[in-house]
Amino acid sequence: TLEETALLDYQGSQDICTLKGVDDQFRKVTAIDSVLLDGDFVLQQGEVSLAILGAGLASRLNVNHQNPYESLTVYMPNQNQRGPLDMPFTRQFAYPVGRFSIKQDYDYQYVFVSLAFIRSLVESPDAVSGIEIKLTPGADAEKVKEKILALIKTPVNVKNKDEQNAAFFKLMNIEKWISFAVVSLT
């Protein structure tokens, strides 16, 4: 996978998002189909790039994923800009074809696109920011983590699902305590 921050524009409404470029194997590794509210998890049809937006982000941008004529314009800083005459942003178009809902922070932030789409935006055909691995039932996550670290010689972060969600759980705990304090003070 490859994640990058981008600016989206849909019919004049704009918002910052995290683009998550995924390959064809993503459906097999995740339960993405179970969190789709509308549409199918298809990110490319021939030469046409498609996008699946988080429900919150789609709502903020007022996206109509059933309108085949309106595309999202996706802007990213041009990382290869050499001088003042070079374009400061790269731009690509993708058609919104569905919405997903996982949890609020994802729903208001993430957009799924094809890995090829985001690689063309960053102008790097081999760019990767993460690899997602599905373990077989009963596999020991810590042993798998150790084996991955032993295989890869460069320093990398290997996180299991609980470690990835730690920040979210910490935030939820803080919100719970703030709610408790507000109720206690009234």
Give residue spans per PLM region.
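Generic short beta-strand segments
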Residues: 1-6, 56, 75-79
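Short, solvent-exposed hinge/capping segments at secondary-structure junctions
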Residues: 31, 53-68
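Peri-transmembrane interface segments
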Residues: 137, 141-186
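The feature marks short, hydrophobic/small-residue-biased sequence motifs that occur predominantly
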Residues: 5-45, 96
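Basic-flanked hydrophobic alpha-helices used for secretion and membrane insertion
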Residues: 52-53, 67-155
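A generic structural signal for short hydrophobic patches within well-formed alpha-helices
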Residues: 27, 57-58, 118
